[in-house]
């Protein structure tokens, strides 16, 4: 099964080797036919503390690194 890759924005870089990434998804509501935006936060592993708050990044699924970390930062995303 392929690993999922998501794009988002770093919302926090306070912890060592960890960033919080907010990923937004858009979908059309089935009844209202209106575009809805939902966001979810993921904690991702950042080995070298490279990324700072506000950076656009791509994250990929990985084996669990800690209690809450299941994602790794893959690369910086183009804005």
Swiss-Prot record:
It comes from the Bacteria. GO terms for biological process: translation. The keyword Ribonucleoprotein applies. Keywords: Ribonucleoprotein, Ribosomal protein, RNA-binding, rRNA-binding. Pfam families: Ribosomal_S17 (PF00366). GO terms for cellular component: cytosolic small ribosomal subunit. InterPro entries: NA-bd_OB-fold, Ribosomal_uS17, Ribosomal_uS17_bact/chlr. The keyword Transmembrane helix does not apply. GO terms for molecular function: rRNA binding; structural constituent of ribosome. SUPFAM superfamilies: Nucleic acid-binding proteins. Gene3D superfamilies: Nucleic acid-binding proteins (2.40.50.140). Belongs to the universal ribosomal protein uS17 family. Part of the 30S ribosomal subunit. One of the primary rRNA binding proteins, it binds specifically to the 5'-end of 16S ribosomal RNA. This is Small ribosomal subunit protein uS17. It comes from Roseobacter denitrificans (strain ATCC 33942 / OCh 114).
């Amino acid at each position: 099964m392929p690993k999922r890759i998501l794009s988002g924005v770093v919302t926090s870089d306070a912890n060592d080797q960890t960033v919080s990434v907010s990923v937004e998804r858009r979908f059309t509501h089935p009844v209202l036919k209106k575009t809805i935006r939902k966001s979810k936060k993921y904690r991702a592993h950042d080995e070298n503390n490279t990324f700072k708050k506000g950076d656009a990044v791509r994250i990929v699924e990985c084996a669990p690194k800690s209690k809450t970390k299941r994602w790794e930062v893959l690369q910086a995303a183009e804005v």
